[in-house]
């Protein structure tokens, strides 16, 4: 931790005398644990709203799930049911505002998607019809239009693809850092590496959190801790059932422009950033034989040669659809851990056991970060509960809809 951050954190640690339960927005002290894109968005919205925010993370900004995400901003057919699709639509819409306000480069242009199976293609067409009913400008694009959409992509025998024109993609590490910088501009303290270790409660009200950096007096604690399933139990007194799965993200060196859309092809996801780098994401999870070595949830491969092998494997799949990518070299190949609440929906809200602890855990964190940050900050600062978030509360029945 650099000297400037240490001095600022020392100031945050020294604050005393503010009442917990009656804290106003101007005086409310909030510790946000987790400096991924969701935690960063919440921190920015809180700081902008007048709260006194400290952001901690045991490693640093975007070092866990947000680093290893494909970073597809979308409200596609997979966002079910209607209430979750609407939330995702608002997330996409808020990205337009956020990108402009914080100068975050988003590559808009939409996504195209198709499957190998005829049955799955038929179901995709049905799902796109539902998307249209839900207000999306999505459509099935016939084969004769595909070359104009993506001249470099080989579609093989497929005769239609789904086009979702509102989708975009972003560099999640850059976006997270822009949000944190903006939060700091509103007075937030950023402390990395700084691990959450304990919380102190008096009369059921939060008094402070204990970290590897010291004791921080706080009125609220936000757990934006992604795939760390043990932390809600320890700090919020509640279990969040989730299946945390690894996925590999490979990022090439800058290449000539060759993709216009996010391409979701059988076995591989691809998109090209504005700087020319192509991001590859795999669709399949790790084989059972890898479970032992993945038990510690590493973000890095044990050897560079192993990372290179995975990159080349993904490149071979990508070459089937994008021959021009042949010969690409990778800058980064790493493992991302996806927090997947069992019903597939975000967890947003105060713990019923410890109301001063607010949970914000979700898959599709990139798509939802702007709207989740806005809603979470509003609930924390005002003390109100937004009816729209009732279906996402941490004490819901996760078995009603089991997706993961």
Question: What are the language-model segments listed below?
Answer:
Residues 2-23:
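N-terminal export signals
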Residues 30-54:
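N-terminal Rossmann-like FAD-binding beta1-loop-alpha1 element of flavoenzymes
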Residues 48-66:
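Glycine-rich FAD pyrophosphate-binding loop
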Residues 71-149, 267-269, 277, 298, ...:
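Dinucleotide-binding Rossmann-like beta1-alpha1 core, especially the glycine-rich loop
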Residues 93, 104-107, 116-186, 191-192, ...:
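Flavin (FAD/FMN) cofactor-binding and adjacent substrate-gating region
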Residues 219-260:
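Central helical "cap/lid" subdomain
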Residues 256-354:
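Active-site lid/adjacent beta-loop-alpha segment flanking the redox-cofactor pocket in flavoenzymes
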Residues 319-404:
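C-terminal catalytic lobe of FAD-dependent flavoproteins
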């Amino acid at each position: 931790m650099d000297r400037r951050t240490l001095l600022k954190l020392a100031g945050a640690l020294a604050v005393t005398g503010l009442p917990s339960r009656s804290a106003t927005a101007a005086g409310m002290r909030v510790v946000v644990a987790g400096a991924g894109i969701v935690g960063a968005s919440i921190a920015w919205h809180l700081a902008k709203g007048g709260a006194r925010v400290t952001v901690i993370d045991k490693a640093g900004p975007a070092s866990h799930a947000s680093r290893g995400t494909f970073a597809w901003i979308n409200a596609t057919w997979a966002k079910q049911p209607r209430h979750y699709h609407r939330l995702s639509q608002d997330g996409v819409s808020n990205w337009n505002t956020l990108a402009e306000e914080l100068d975050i480069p988003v590559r808009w242009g939409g996504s195209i998607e198709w499957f190998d199976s005829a049955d799955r293609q038929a179901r995709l067409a049905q799902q796109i019809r539902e998307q249209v009913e839900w207000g999306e400008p999505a459509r099935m694009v016939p084969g004769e239009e595909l070359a104009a959409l993506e001249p470099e992509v080989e579609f093989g025998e497929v005769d239609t693809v789904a086009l979702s024109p509102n989708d975009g993609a972003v560099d999640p590490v850059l976006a997270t850092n822009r949000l944190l910088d903006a939060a700091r501009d509103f007075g937030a303290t950023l402390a990395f590496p700084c691990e959450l270790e304990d919380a102190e409660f008096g009369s059921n009200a939060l008094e402070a959190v204990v970290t590897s950096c010291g004791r921080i007096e706080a009125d609220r604690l936000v757990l934006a801790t992604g795939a760390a399933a043990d932390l809600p139990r320890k700090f919020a007194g509640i279990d969040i059932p989730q299946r945390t799965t690894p996925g590999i993200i490979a990022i090439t060196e800058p290449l000539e422009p060759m993709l216009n859309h996010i391409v979701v092809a059988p076995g591989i996801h691809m998109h090209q950033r504005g700087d020319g780098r192509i991001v590859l994401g795999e669709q399949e999870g790790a084989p059972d034989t890898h479970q032992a070595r993945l038990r510690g949830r590493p973000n890095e491969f044990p050897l560079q040669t192993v990372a290179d092998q995975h990159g080349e494997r993904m490149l071979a799949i990508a070459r089937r659809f994008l021959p021009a990518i042949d010969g690409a070299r990778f800058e980064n190949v790493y493992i991302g851990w996806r927090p997947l609440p069992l019903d597939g929906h975000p967890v947003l809200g105060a713990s019923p056991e410890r109301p001063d602890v607010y949970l914000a855990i979700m898959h599709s964190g990139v798509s939802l970060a702007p709207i989740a940050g806005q809603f979470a900050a509003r609930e924390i600062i005002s003390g109100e509960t937004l009816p729209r978030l009732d279906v996402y509360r941490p004490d819901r029945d996760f078995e009603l809809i089991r997706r993961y």
